[in-house]
From Swiss-Prot:
Pfam families named in the record: zf-FLZ
InterPro entries: Zf-FLZ_dom
Record text on subunit structure and interactions: Interacts with KIN10 and KIN11 via its FLZ-type zinc finger domain. Interacts with KINB3 via its N-terminal part. Forms homodimer and heterodimer with FLZ1, FLZ2 and FLZ15 in vitro.
Superkingdom assignment: Eukaryota
Zinc finger (FLZ-type): 72-116
Name used for this protein in its record: FCS-Like Zinc finger 7
UniProt-annotated location(s): Cytoplasm; Nucleus
Alphabetically ordered keywords of this record: Cytoplasm, Metal-binding, Nucleus, Zinc, Zinc-finger
């Protein structure tokens, strides 16, 4: 007897969709709307309050002059020092450096790997 190949109990099936009957009015064609309306349910003032962030917005406005300030590393490319344009892709490396292109990111990675290799070679052997 092979392990893991024991017979399994039969899976219980749920109600099939073929057993569900839908009444269709023959008077309308597809795409016609009769008296169909959508109702927007308003939960009142307290409804939306549950989903708001508990951030003190007044303090943030004082700190940043009413606008949000991006982190300093998101302003310029970490390799070529060009400005990072809003709405453009940003390429990250080690979580603390942003780059304008894949090429700049790869060059920084190669530079860091070179520094690591030199550190290993220069360390005294025991």
């Amino acid at each position: 007897m092979l392990l893991g190949n024991r017979p399994r109990p039969q899976m219980q099936r749920t109600a099939s969709i073929t057993r569900i009957t839908i009444e269709v009015d023959g008077d309308q064609t597809a795409g016609q709307d009769s008296d169909v309306s959508m109702t927007v349910v308003d939960g009142g003032e307290n409804y939306a309050q549950r989903f708001l962030s508990p951030v003190n917005h007044q303090r943030n406005e004082r700190k940043y002059g009413g606008r949000s300030s991006p982190s300093s590393f998101l302003v310029n490319c970490g390799f070529c020092k060009r400005g990072l344009a809003p709405g453009r892709d940003i390429y990250m490396y080690k979580g603390d450096a942003a780059f304008c292109s894949i090429e700049c990111r790869e060059q920084q990675m190669e530079h860091d790997e070179g520094k690591t290799r030199n550190r290993v070679v220069l360390s005294p052997s025991k």
